[in-house]
Amino acid sequence: MNKKLLVTCFEPFNQKKVNSSFVAVEKLADKIGDYNLTKLTVPVVYGKAFETVHLKIEELKPDVILCVGQAGGRKNVTLEKIAINYRSATICDNEGNKYDGIKIDENGDDGIFVNLEVEKLAEISGCEVSLSAGSFVCNDLIYMIRNYYQDKVQAGFIHVPYLPEQTKGDSASLSLEEIVLKLTLIIENL
């Protein structure tokens, strides 16, 4: 039976021309395992990222949502275990918003675990588990999805490293082929 998978990625941000999450998600096949993929690029803007994804969720009614974002400095693809109710970053989003330690939802839980088996998926795919999606727009998106939808839909977040062409010297990066392979393995084993 074919299932619906919504896979999101982000536009470039912080005055960069490339976002590795966008490049990798665009390279994914349209059908992987039991899943028909719908790909969606979202803005790197607090709140608007969720608004964009929320509209697509309501239209598509996916079985699973996988959000993919870029995390410079990481050497491997990482599955995020928890989203935190916190906005704080040293850089602005793509509309110039910058927060220094505020809650996403004043009445929300401090943290919400994703409802995917991240340890199992990491082991199968050769990825790592991370306990922090940060406090920028990536975390904002997965927190808002989990807070709004609770367990009505499975949702998780995956951070991918920079691509080699985004780095200088021996900075952490991973090839596009390796990132796409790991994302594919994760999807095949959802």
Where do the PLM segments sit?
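C-terminal folded domains that constitute the principal catalytic or ligand-binding module
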Residues: 123, 145, 153-166, 184-188
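N-terminal catalytic or cofactor-binding beta/alpha core of small enzyme domains
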Residues: 1-135, 146-151, 171-177, 187-190
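Active-site glycine-rich loop that binds ribose-phosphate moieties when present
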Residues: 137-139
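Mixed-charge interfacial surface used for oligomerization/domain docking
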Residues: 167, 179-180
